[in-house]
Amino acid sequence: MDYTKDSGSTTAQRRQRQIEECLFTSLLQRPYPSVSISDLCHQLGISRKSFYNYFPDKDACLQAIISRKLHTCIRNLRAELAENPTEEQIIASYLSYWKEEKNLLDIIVRNDLLSLLEDQCIRFLREDEQHLLSILDTPQLQTVNFVLAGFVSLQVTMILQWHLQNYQPLIFRKGDN
């Protein structure tokens, strides 16, 4: 389920965002298992019931954060695609976005949440599955799922390795295997 969609009102959207930001800030300081819903509610001055009006659990809140970041990344790339960039510019823009999201990547690495990021990436890509089917020119959903899972795993692994290497320049040469 996508918890980043319209909650019905601006106040609800604002509260949802506040909960997400509180979790994100807490995770910058403490490990994921040690951050409780009670802690978040106390910091925000809300009841646990209020938290559960927006998210069924802490994982869903973190998923919403990741989903929002993925939507922002793709929105930025789509805006750039409208300007007919080169492949190198597209890749540079994509990597630049993830470099700016260093804190999120730190949280994922420190808390061993790679599978959560991969799941959100796959979910995000499936949102536009018909478009993906036309791009891949295949009607077989199993093939698409396999390709998506492989792509996401490769992409996430590459981004996290780059992050762990402190964003050292990536060098790709023709003929490299």
Predicted regions located by residue number:
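Short hydrophobic/aromatic patch on the recognition helix
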Residues: 45-55
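Basic, helix-initiating cap at the start of DNA-binding domains
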Residues: 1-26, 30, 39, 43
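Alpha-helical residues within helix-turn-helix
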Residues: 36-39, 60
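Amphipathic alpha-helical packing segments from all-alpha helical-bundle domains
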Residues: 112-156, 176
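C-terminal peripheral helix-coil segments that are non-catalytic and often amphipathic
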Residues: 153, 157-177
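Residues in the helix-turn-helix
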Residues: 36, 50, 104
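Helical hydrophobic small-molecule/effector-binding pocket
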Residues: 84-130
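Alpha-helical structural segments
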Residues: 14-25, 43, 60-80, 89, ...
